[in-house]
Design a protein with these regions (language model features):
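Hydrophobic alpha-helical membrane segments
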Residues: 1-242
């Protein structure tokens, strides 16, 4: 039976009934960890503008520490989602189980590291092709980045952001088959990370574009909520949206 993306979303909302609190709790844990390390790394880079060897090494260590701390939470949240989808008892404590078991901790870190390396490899290829091709065709597009004219800089930055978006789309589409891997590890912690990646690629066959569609709808929903929240914030602050 073929199920539309919209029907799958309705099924998901039905399964979430009465479990929003535990789900939001798991997402909050992951968000707090992610924001904490992101803020730490950004603050460090802002106070160390000289990119010498020591600065780069420290930034890499912060990134590695971030991966080690957030990876178990990422797989743990998927475990929580799996409990909800399979109508099992869902508890926030299930997220922290991945920190208390050495084997789970290790495998979650290795899996998320492999996913990050796959994304990085795809990004290097596509960003290199897009930006290299753009520079070969029209080098003047990037000349404005070093200009003293603010309008030239703004125009060049717009070009850079547009090219980055163009490169990001194929990068994402290439790594899509490996995105469900954390769910597979969450369902069976005894699986090795490489096995999860291989099985993820096989499992998504025939459902590739449906998976992309689900993620796209979720992304658009987040943007819509953010837009509405910004309008409400402006109105409550006494601003005029017109």
């Amino acid at each position: 039976m073929k199920l539309s993306v919209f029907y799958l979303r309705r099924m998901g909302r039905a399964l979430m009934h009465g479990k929003y609190t535990v789900c939001l709790g798991g997402m909050t844990v992951l968000l707090v960890f992610s924001l904490a390390f992101s803020t730490l790394e950004q603050s460090f880079l802002n106070t160390n503008l000289d990119l010498d060897g020591k600065t780069i090494l420290t930034a890499l260590l912060i990134a590695v520490l971030s991966l080690a701390v957030t990876s178990p939470a990422q797989v743990g949240v998927r475990s929580l989602f799996g409990d909800i989808a399979n109508q099992r008892e869902a508890k926030l404590a299930h997220v922290f189980q991945w920190y208390g078991d050495g084997k789970r901790l290790n495998r979650s870190i290795v899996l998320m590291l492999l996913q990050s390396l796959l994304f990085l490899a795809a990004a290097v290829v596509f960003f290199g092709l897009v930006f290299g091709g753009a520079y070969a065709i029209h080098p003047e597009w990037f000349a404005g980045l070093t200009s003293n004219n603010i309008f030239a800089v703004a125009d060049a930055l717009t070009t850079v952001y547009t090219l980055a978006l163009v490169a990001l789309v194929p990068t994402y589409l290439v790594v899509v088959p490996f995105l469900p891997a954390p769910y597979l590890l969450a369902e069976d912690p005894e699986k090795k990370p490489l096995v999860c990646l291989r099985e993820s690629r096989r499992a998504i066959r025939g459902f590739y574009w449906k998976y992309v569609g689900l993620q796209l709808l979720s992304f658009l929903q987040v943007i819509a909520y953010a837009f509405l929240a910004s309008i409400v914030a402006v109105l409550f602050s006494g601003g005029d949206i017109t």
